[in-house]
């Protein structure tokens, strides 16, 4: 049986209690949503990817916090009871970076190595090796394809990666102490 949304190798998904990741396919009635995520993806907290037809995400793509990708309007324009409206496939080619809270709408193709600025709304295709930003997203700058280093290179040296993660862990956890843990155990924050 084919997976509804296969996730590529070496994917990094970062969820938080206030930033749950939502990967959804709508498979009811005539709708047969599919989602394919390539290798080396980075999906940050609060990302929502919703498919009623097909969303294809290439290798080494990155999603900033709260980014939203959909291939549907989720309701008909005239018939508001029409559940998924008229979905259109979305394609993100390899090494695309979607900024925080950006919205990628149905029917869009984003070319390889492109960057979508934070808070942008993309309703039309994006050329490869480009930066687009704004609402609606507009061309900002052409990128030199020869200068681009894809996310998969992050994994090319496992020893360096391990060392980098140890440094990162020390930075993130440096303020954690036994006393802090005991205090949090007995005086819990009501939100956690």
Describe the predicted segments one by one.
Residues 73-74, 80-82, 108, 142-143:
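Conserved catalytic-core motifs of eukaryotic protein kinase domains, centered on the activation segment
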């Amino acid at each position: 049986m084919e997976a509804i949304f296969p996730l590529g190798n070496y994917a990094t998904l970062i969820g938080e209690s206030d930033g749950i990741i939502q990967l959804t396919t709508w498979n009811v009635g005539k709708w047969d949503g599919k989602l394919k995520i390539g290798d080396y993806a980075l999906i940050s907290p609060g990302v929502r990817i919703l498919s009623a037809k097909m969303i294809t995400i290439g290798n080494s793509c990155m999603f900033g916090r709260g980014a939203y990708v959909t291939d549907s309007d989720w309701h008909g324009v005239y018939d508001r009871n029409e559940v998924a409206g008229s979905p259109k496939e979305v394609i993100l080619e390899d090494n695309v970076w979607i900024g925080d809270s950006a919205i990628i709408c149905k029917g869009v193709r984003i070319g390889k190595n492109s960057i979508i600025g934070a808070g942008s709304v993309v309703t039309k295709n994006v050329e490869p090796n480009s930066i687009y930003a704004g609402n609606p997203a507009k061309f900002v700058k052409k990128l030199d394809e020869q200068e681009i280093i894809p996310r998969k290179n992050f994994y090319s040296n496992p020893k360096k990666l391990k060392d980098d993660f140890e440094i990162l862990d020390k930075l993130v956890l440096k303020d954690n102490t036994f006393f802090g843990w005991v205090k949090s155990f007995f005086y819990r924050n009501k939100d956690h």
